[in-house]
Design a protein with these regions (language model features):
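Aromatic-rich carbohydrate-binding modules that target alpha-glucans
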Residues: 34-78, 88-110
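Conserved acidic catalytic loop of the alpha/beta-hydrolase fold
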Residues: 249-268
């Protein structure tokens, strides 16, 4: 009864008075195939934040008394989305009965509750082992696995050294620190197979062409607590809210280690921090709150919408900082709702306006760009990373 009151009756009652509800419920009912492990947890993974942005998980389903897997997600009315069913990762994604690929399943949130019923024919791991992925790392890379911390979970750190590093023992280099490090250098560890930033190849090409000065790239892997690490505030929908601890890890533990181990420059203008999505959000916060450490910020496709655009309020309260900021957003990063609202794009525009209002100057210490048709994934970010790196590393 509670579910019907929440999703089934109240939208109709509101509609009688001309009120459009802010959210609509989409209920999933999944029938799993024979042979599904009895302790399996099923997930709906899709292309919107509420479904995990294709992270292999997203919305966790629970088992109903009838033995089906059920769950409900709230979305703005009119939101179109695509999804698949998994058991928590892409190695266990749903397949056809003969092991073939299935197309992304479509869905749309309407004003009332919609129920989407799915029959999973088979799971990927019933037919094949996940293919071995070949490493695509290039250049002089040093590995620091399971780097320990008092503040956050241990994680791998990869350090890419520029051409000529070993041959110039007296030279020191600026540092570019990048979040979601699994996606930065290596298609074998990237979130989606083969979709990596190609930061190592791009940096080497720019350095050899004289378009940027030689620099050290540091790829810092995420952890299962990614939302917590990359967000300062708790979002009532998703949790999070511990990036102050992640900042302490970077500033008090990782940077001192890098400075002891490698020939780094340590002025704020010689330290750049770059990330995408929630990584773009935490990059901006690191610049705002620790401008004495990080003087250059790459905020790529930032999740400005997090916690009711809290970062926009923070920019206004904090005011201008001596930090150079690259910020961009793809126009295809959020599916329009029925009324044309696009949360990612409009939130990025609000952040741009707040930065300008606080004193950042477009073309001087702020670059803002909307990339027509660009989606929210590593391939799109790789396609523009050369311009990001060149603008941030340019001497000014």
């Amino acid at each position: 009864m509670g579910s019907r009151l929440r999703y089934g009756w109240w939208p109709m009652l509101l509609g009688m008075f001309g009120v459009v509800p802010a959210v609509a419920g989409v209920r999933f009912e999944v029938r799993a195939p024979a042979g599904t492990p009895p302790d399996a947890v099923l997930w709906i993974s899709g292309d919107v934040a509420e479904l995990g942005h294709w992270n292999g998980a997203g919305l966790r389903l629970t088992t109903s008394p009838e033995g089906r897997y059920v769950g409900t997600v709230e979305l703005p009315p009119g939101t179109a989305f695509a999804f698949k069913v998994t058991r928590g990762d892409w190695g266990t994604v749903e397949k056809t009965a003969t092991g073939g690929e299935i197309a992304n399943r479509p869905g749309r949130a309407s004003a009332g509750e919609d129920t989407i019923r799915i029959e999973v024919a088979a799971w990927r791991d019933a037919f094949e082992k996940a293919p071995t992925r070949t490493s695509t790392i290039t250049g002089n890379v040093r590995r620091h696995p399971a780097f320990p911390s008092r503040f956050v979970d241990a994680r791998d750190v990869l350090v890419w050294l520029p051409p000529g590093y070993d041959a110039a023992p007296r030279r020191r280099y600026p540092v570019v620190l990048m979040h979601d490090g699994q996606n930065v250098f290596d298609g074998a560890t990237s979130f989606l197979p083969g979709m990596e930033w190609q930061a190592d190849e791009t940096a080497e090409r720019l350095i050899r062409a004289g378009r940027i000065p030689p620099c050290i790239l540091v790829a810092v892997a995420n952890s299962p607590a990614r939302r917590e690490d990359y967000t300062l505030e708790v979002d009532p929908r998703y949790g999070g809210g511990r990036s102050d601890r992640y900042a302490r890890f970077l500033i008090e533990e990782l940077l001192p280690f890098l400075d002891r181990t490698y020939r780094t420059r340590t002025r704020p203008e010689d330290r750049t921090v770059i990330g995408s999505s929630l990584g773009g959000l935490v990059s901006l916060d690191l610049g705002l709150l620790h401008s004495d450490v990080f003087g250059r910020v790459g905020s790529i496709s930032p999740a400005v919408w997090w916690a009711d655009r809290a970062v926009v309020t923070r920019v206004t309260a904090t005011g201008h900082r001596p930090v150079r900021v690259w910020m961009d957003i793809g126009t295809a990063e959020s599916t329009p709702t029925a009324d044309g609202h696009r949360e990612w794009l409009e939130s990025a525009q609000a952040l741009r306006d707040a930065l300008v209002g606080a004193g950042w100057r477009v073309g001087r210490d702020l670059h803002y760009e909307e990339i027509e048709g660009a989606p929210h994934n590593e391939s799109a970010w790789a396609a523009r990373f050369d311009r990001v790196l060149e603008w941030l590393q340019a001497e000014r």
